[in-house]
C-alpha cells in the first residue's frame, strides 16, 4: 500500500499544504487522477474545500474531483489513482463516509494500488478507528471503526504543552485514559509538521519534530525522522 499520513495541513510561515507538496510529488509515481473526500469540512463548504485542494495540487499535474460532485461515487473511487481525505472534523468525516457506503470501497482501492493522502482527520480515518482524534463529537458516526489501512492509532497535532495556569489534562493523559480501556492499542503522538509515509511495505516517520509512541503500562518512547514502524 501507498499512504501519506500528515499530522496537519499548514505550518507557520508556509502556505496551505506547502510542506506536503514535495512529499506528494515524490509519491505520485505517475498517478494523476484523484478523488477528494471533503466531508470533514464544517466551516467551509465541500465545494470550497475541493476547489482549494484542486488549486494547490494542479501544479503537480493532479486532477482533483470532489466525491460529492459525482453521480456515482463508487465508480469514481474505483477509477481513482489517488484518494485524498482532507482534515476538519473526524466525526463528520466518518459519518458521511459511512452513510454513503464509501469506507470499504476506499480501503479496497488503496489496497489495490491507489495512493492514499490524508491530513489530520484524514490521517485518523486511515487508522483502525478514530478513537485518537482530538475533535469534538459534533455528530454521531454510528461507530468508530475506520479504514484500517495503517495498523496503529495516530493522534495528529500532538503536543503535551499546556497554557500557563491551565488545569486540564495533557494530551498524554488523554491517551493514557484510552489505553486503560483499550490496552491492546499503540498510539502515535504525531506532532505538527510530521508525517508517516508508507511505500513498498515500509512505514517511515518523517518531519523535524520528536514523535511519541504510547503503549499501556510502558513509558512513552521518543522517535525521530527515519524511524521505521
From Swiss-Prot:
Q: List the disulfide bonds.
A: none
Q: Does the keyword Magnesium apply?
A: no
GO biological process entries: proteolysis
The EC number(s) this enzyme carries: 3.4.13.21
Is Transit peptide found in the keyword set?
no
What Gene3D superfamilies does the record tag this protein with? 3.40.50.880
- Catalytically driven reaction(s): Dipeptidase E catalyzes the hydrolysis of dipeptides Asp-|-Xaa. It does not act on peptides with N-terminal Glu, Asn or Gln, nor does it cleave isoaspartyl peptides
| Record-linked CDD domains | GAT1_Peptidase_E
What Gene Ontology terms describe where this protein resides (cellular component)?
cytoplasm
Superkingdom to which the source organism belongs: Bacteria
Enzyme class per UniProt: hydrolase
Q: Which UniProt keywords apply?
A: Cytoplasm, Dipeptidase, Hydrolase, Protease, Serine protease
Annotated Pfam families: Peptidase_S51
Q: List the catalytic residues.
A: 120, 135, 157
InterPro entries documented for this protein: Class_I_gatase-like (IPR029062), Peptidase_S51 (IPR005320), Peptidase_S51_dipeptidase-E (IPR023172)
User: What PANTHER family does UniProt report for this protein, alphabetically?
Assistant: ALPHA-ASPARTYL DIPEPTIDASE, PROTEASE S51 ALPHA-ASPARTYL DIPEPTIDASE
Describe the function of this protein: Hydrolyzes dipeptides containing N-terminal aspartate residues. May play a role in allowing the cell to use peptide aspartate to spare carbon otherwise required for the synthesis of the aspartate family of amino acids.
- Identify its protein family: Belongs to the peptidase S51 family.
Its protein name is Peptidase E
Amino acid at each position: 500500500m501507498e499512504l501519506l499520513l500528515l499530522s496537519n495541513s499548514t505550518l507557520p510561515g508556509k502556505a496551505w499544504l506547502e510542506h506536503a507538496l514535495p512529499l506528494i510529488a515524490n509519491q505520485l509515481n505517475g498517478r494523476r487522477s484523484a478523488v477528494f473526500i471533503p466531508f470533514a469540512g464544517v466551516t467551509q463548504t465541500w465545494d470550497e474545500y475541493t476547489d482549494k485542494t484542486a488549486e494547490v495540487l494542479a501544479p503537480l499535474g493532479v486532477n482533483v474531483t470532489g466525491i460529492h460532485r459525482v453521480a456515482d461515487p463508487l465508480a469514481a473511487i474505483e477509477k481513482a489513482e489517488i484518494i485524498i481525505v482532507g482534515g476538519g472534523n473526524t466525526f463528520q468525516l466518518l459519518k458521511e463516509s459511512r452513510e454513503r457506503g464509501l469506507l470499504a470501497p476506499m480501503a479496497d482501492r488503496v489496497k489495490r494500488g491507489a495512493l492514499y493522502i490524508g491530513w489530520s482527520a484524514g490521517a485518523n480515518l486511515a487508522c483502525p478507528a478514530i478513537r485518537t482524534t482530538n475533535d469534538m463529537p459534533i455528530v454521531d458516526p454510528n461507530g468508530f471503526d475506520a479504514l484500517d489501512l495503517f495498523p496503529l492509532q495516530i493522534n495528529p497535532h500532538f503536543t503535551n504543552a499546556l497554557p500557563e495556569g491551565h488545569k486540564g489534562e495533557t494530551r498524554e493523559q488523554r491517551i493514557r485514559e484510552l489505553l486503560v480501556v483499550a490496552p491492546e492499542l499503540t498510539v502515535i503522538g504525531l506532532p505538527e509538521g510530521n508525517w508517516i509515509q508508507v511505500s513498498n511495505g515500509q512505514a517511515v516517520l518523517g518531519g523535524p519534530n520528536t514523535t511519541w509512541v504510547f503503549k499501556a503500562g510502558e513509558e512513552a518512547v521518543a522517535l525521530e525522522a527515519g524511524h521505521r514502524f
